[in-house]
Amino acid sequence: SMIHKAMTELRRVYIDYTPAPMCVCSAMSQGYVGYDIQNSLRAELLDRGISKPVSTILTQVTVDPYDEAFYEPTKVIGRYMSKEDAEIEVKKGNYVKEDPGKGFRRVVAAPKPIDIVEIEAIRTLAAADQVVIACGGGGIPVIEQKHALKGASAVIEKDAIAGKLASDLSCDELIILTTVPYVYKNFGKEDQAALETLTVAEAKDLIAAGQFEEGTMLPKIEAAISYLEKVPAGKVLITSMDHVKDAIKGKAGTVITA
C-alpha cells in the first residue's frame, strides 16, 4: 500500500477561491493526487509488462475529539492572509499564525489517528495482490457520532498514519521517503553523521537527546517506533526518492529494527 502527502496546491495563495471545510479539502486532495499516482503507476506497470490493478481508496481516519491537539493547534495550512482576513478567522474561532513578511495562515490541530475506517477494504485489495493508494495526506480526519462520521477541522500527520497502516496490515516493511538519503545524528552540524542502522531503543535515546526536529524527522522516527512495537519482525527504511533503489538493495538509507 502507498501513502502520499497532501497536494501542494492547497497551500498556495489564491486571490479568488471557494471556501470548503478542512475534511472536504482532504478528500479533494486524496482524489486529485491519488488519480495522478494511480494512472502513472498503472502506465509504468503496463510498460514493464505487468498487469496489476491499481486502486485509490478514499480513506477516513477516526480521531479523538478530546485529543489535546485540538486545544493547541500546530499545523500551518492554507493560503496567506492579510491581517484583516486573519482577524476575521480569529472571530470565527479559528487559529492563525503570522509568517513575518508574508502574512498570516490558518493553524489547525494534528490529532493522533485512532482507526482507519476503510482498513478492511484496503486489506482485501492488498491480499488480492493489488496496488493500493490509501490514507492520502494522512487520511480524512473524522469523529464518530453514533453511527455517523463527522469531518474534523484538522489534519493527520502522514507519517503517523503510515505507521498505523503498516501495523494494521502487518506489513513486512515500511518505507518512508523524505528529502535526505539517511537519518542523521547532529543534522546540519559539522559533525553530522549518517545512521545506517538503528534499533527502537537507540531511536528512543536519540529522541530523548533532542536529535530529531519536530515536523521533519521526528514524526518519521515516531512512526517507525510505533510500527515496530506492533510488528517486531518488521523493518523500517528511511531514505530519499533519489536513493530508494539503492536503499532497497541495502546500499543506502537508514534501516530501523526492533
Go through the PLM ranges and name each one.
Residues 1-258:
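C-terminal catalytic "cap/lid" subdomain
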